[in-house]
Amino acid sequence: MSRYRGARLRVTRRLGDLPGLTRKAAKRSYPPGQHGQARRKRSEYAIRLEEKQKLRFNYGVSERQLVRYVKKARAQGGSTGTNLLKLLENRLDNVCFRLGFGPTIPGSRQLVNHGHVTVNGRVVDIASYQCKAGDVIAIREKKPSKKLAETNLEFPGLANIPPHLELEKSKLTAKVVGKCEREWVALEINELLVVEYYSRKV
């Protein structure tokens, strides 16, 4: 399953607030479609599937990528759900979003893919790059790159930068100073349900 490129508000109407996907709030609180307002009891599978979809759409990863992250999270030991969230939070596109360099995760991914971002002094155009403690993330010293980031920083997607990231706004540089903790994840998600969803599939 490829990365979603359709109407974002349609997704948020179905899944709820996804801060990484879009800034806009859905005007209607019920799911889209002819039967969107109908009340019916959902199965446990449907609930787990919805939580998985929240994770996939918020971070903008394909089903195949998410499966790989689940396998990696499981191999790390400890809480698979927490490990999974940390892996997604440490993606370079998400880190750029949390810093305010991009308005959303898709916007930040575009910033990375187009070569506007450096890590430790080198251009990194791979959105899935795993940021780690000590990494210095910066916007390239080019006028178009700086203008893009400066514009986005005026209206960041999220109000607060998590404590494991330090931003020097005037220099358009930041540093990863620690590990991302579960409570700093902006998305409202029950990651245990995601792990349960994949328990028989992965």
Swiss-Prot record:
Record keywords, A-Z: Ribonucleoprotein, Ribosomal protein, RNA-binding, rRNA-binding
Domain S4 RNA-binding, first and last residues per copy: 90-152
Region (Disordered): 18-42
Molecular function via GO: rRNA binding; structural constituent of ribosome
GO BP annotations listed: ribosomal small subunit biogenesis; translation
PROSITE patterns: RIBOSOMAL_S4, S4
Domain of life the protein comes from: Bacteria
A Pfam family of this chain: S4
Subunit structure: Part of the 30S ribosomal subunit. Contacts protein S5. The interaction surface between S4 and S5 is involved in control of translational fidelity.
HAMAP family per the UniProt record, alphabetical: Ribosomal_uS4_B (MF_01306_B)
Protein role: One of the primary rRNA binding proteins, it binds directly to 16S rRNA where it nucleates assembly of the body of the 30S subunit.
Protein name according to UniProt: Small ribosomal subunit protein uS4
The species this protein was found in: Synechococcus sp. (strain RCC307)
Designated gene of the protein: rpsD
